[in-house]
Amino acid sequence: MPRRREVPKREILPDPKYHNAEVAKFVNVLMTRGKKSVAERIIYGAMDQIHKKTGKDPVEVFTQALSNVRPMVEVKSRRVGGANYQVPVEVRSIRRNALAMRWLRDAARKRAEKSMGARLAGELAEAAEGRGGAVKKREEVHRMAEANKAFAHYRF
């Protein structure tokens, strides 16, 4: 527990193109080495590709992809009497969003398309339909939690 006052969460301003705070947060997640304009270009390019491919609103596809990737439970290691147990715990909403964005980014980076924009567009489109690497990661985490349900009484 920190002894000083609790630091308030910084409010993330909505992005300039879609006026959506989640898109702005995803820009920050995708950004490397402080190059925000490059991250924005990649995301907006991916959104344009999604609009061309599916004909749907890209922000709706993005939010659907996020909701399909958000984990409900995860496992945390807990040491009890010399043994490590994987204890399933519920994920708080802020961490749920952060994990979903991170998994989408990582799954997009592992894809085979040429540009990052194309990879991201493909991953977002697949995640919105309930397929893709990020959704697979979520299912894997849920399976681990289900398999270790017996240790749920070792709550944190």
Swiss-Prot record:
The keyword RNA-binding applies. Coiled coil: none annotated. PROSITE patterns: RIBOSOMAL_S7 (PS00052). One of its GO terms (cellular component) is small ribosomal subunit. Keywords: Ribonucleoprotein, Ribosomal protein, RNA-binding, rRNA-binding, tRNA-binding. Gene3D superfamilies: Ribosomal protein S7 domain. The keyword Zinc-finger does not apply. GO terms for molecular function: rRNA binding; structural constituent of ribosome; tRNA binding. GO terms for biological process: translation. Belongs to the universal ribosomal protein uS7 family. Part of the 30S ribosomal subunit. Contacts proteins S9 and S11. One of the primary rRNA binding proteins, it binds directly to 16S rRNA where it nucleates assembly of the head domain of the 30S subunit. Is located at the subunit interface close to the decoding center, probably blocks exit of the E-site tRNA. HAMAP family: Ribosomal_uS7_B. This is Small ribosomal subunit protein uS7. The lineage of its organism: Bacteria, Pseudomonadati, Pseudomonadota, Betaproteobacteria, Nitrosomonadales.
